[in-house]
Every structure is written in C-alpha cells, then in structure tokens.
Amino acid sequence: MAAANPFKVTDLVAKYGWQFMGYLANLGVNVPRNAAVIFVDSAATNATDADDTEHGHSFDKPCATLEYAIGLCTDGQGDVILIAPGHTETITTAAPCTVDISDLTIVGLGVGLNRPTFSLGTNTAATINVTAANVTIKNIRVVSALANVAIGITVAATATGVWIEDCELRDGGTSILELVIGISLAAAATDATILNCDFLTVTGGG
C-alpha cells in the first residue's frame, strides 16, 4: 500500500529548503527526485500511524512505527524513511516487521544508545524481515527482549543487493535474553553488504 498523500522530495524542499538535501547527503542518503520521505518517531507527542496529509511528513507529526511507514512507501521509487533518535519499537509476533519495498532506504538518526531501538520479544520468531531487493538499513539497534530470539534481521533470498550498515545487534542485557543470530542471509541473497555492524553478547550469552 503506497501512501494516498505522499510527501515527495519537492515537498521536502518547499518546506525545509534545499539545505535539507545537503543534510540527507551527509547521512549518505541519495534521494531520487520522485521519492517520498517519511518521518518516524515513537516519542513525539503527535506521533500517529495515519495516511493523511500530515503524519509522516515531518518530525513534528511523524508516524509512530517503522512497520506502518514501510506500508506508505512505493516499490522501486527510492523512498527514504528517517527514524528519530530515541525511537523505540517492539516487535512481538511471528508475523514480523517486513521490509517488502524495493529500493527503500531506512536511516536511524542518533548515536550510541540514542539510536532507534527495535526490541524483539514475546515470540522467539520475532524479527525484522527483509524480502525486497536493494534495501538499505542504517544506524539502528536490534535487541533481544526474550530468551533465545532466533534472528535479529532476516534477509530472504529475494532481498538481493541488501545493504546493512552501522547497526548494532545484541542480547538484551543478560545472558537469558539471548539473540541467537544477529543477521541471517539466505544463500541466494546475492550482492549483500554488511558494513561496520556490531554483534554483541554478554558474559554467558551465545
């Protein structure tokens, strides 16, 4: 489902000026002219998962979840999702957060523990599931909130060209809350890049 009211690059420039394009370039994000840019921040007072003329168009009125924001994107368009520092999101079911939009770039803002954090819990099959080609994921934290969570980020055979950079995948602070596999790549997921990622466990963890 693409957004009924997409916030395009032209809207971004009209609202924030051309300097915002320089900001995106500094993040290593190349935004095509026709792409949509969607903002996500669970901590914002006005955060709502709604496809209207306001939410997701700025950090003043962002979407509340990455999962919803993905559903607003268009396949093959080069859309970008920006996730605010301090964003938190819990993935709790076996029907995971699925990145099924090709040429999508997801960028977390912030540093250290302030980076967007995705907690996997309730079901050991909870995961961020990448199924589309040419997906980029940058600067997020994926943390186990349950014993023996199987996989942090699952890359399917259809997700050729995936790029995962500057991400942290880790146990949930104790050896009990173990993340068994940080990133799982299907054998047919060719042209994958995993760059500058941290895979962390605690004493007694796996």
Segments and roles (model prediction):
Residues 6-9, 63, 71-72, 108, ...:
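Beta-strand-rich, repetitive solenoid scaffolds
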Residues 28-29, 51-52, 66-75, 89-101, ...:
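Short, T/G/N/S-enriched strand-turn elements that build extracellular solenoid repeat scaffolds
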Residues 37, 78-80, 86-88, 96-98, ...:
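Detector for repetitive beta-architecture
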